[in-house]
Amino acid sequence: MRSRDLRAEMRVPVTRKGALSSGDTLWFPCLIVDMSDSGILIMSNREIPVGEVLDFRCEFFPNQYLECKLEIVHVDDTRLGTKIVEIDEKGTSLCKLFLEEQYAHKLDSVRLK
């Protein structure tokens, strides 16, 4: 991934359950708060230090899971700011499609008000 200012990217509010793992077989739950194409803001009750790289898994569409590695870049109470540090082509396409659908849904909601 290219180095860039993550705040310059559009963040899409999302509420979706996911799971994190530190590489062992134990997964623990998390909740996506928002995301961009290069990072995800997550809520978790686990204390995870900045710099740690975790496996992430989330079902974006029925039987279609995003699986990638996230690096913790900042921690604020129960929220973890992460950047995607490893993702395959399938995951990139799935993430892009999911973000496009979420963004379109948010735009439709604003137009209806």
Placement of each model-derived feature along the sequence:
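Residue-level recognition of conserved beta-strand positions in structured domain cores
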Residues: 44, 58, 70, 84-86
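Short beta-strand-centered aromatic/proline hotspots
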Residues: 29-31, 67-73
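A residue-level detector for short acidic-glycine micro-motifs
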Residues: 34, 72-76, 86
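C-terminal output/interaction extensions
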Residues: 80-113
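Short, conserved beta-turn/loop elements at beta-strand boundaries and strand-helix junctions
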Residues: 23, 37-38, 75-80
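Short, surface-exposed secondary-structure edge patches
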Residues: 9, 43-48
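Short conserved beta-strand and strand-loop elements enriched in small hydrophobics
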Residues: 16-22, 52-65
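N-terminal helix initiation/capping motif
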Residues: 1-35, 100-113
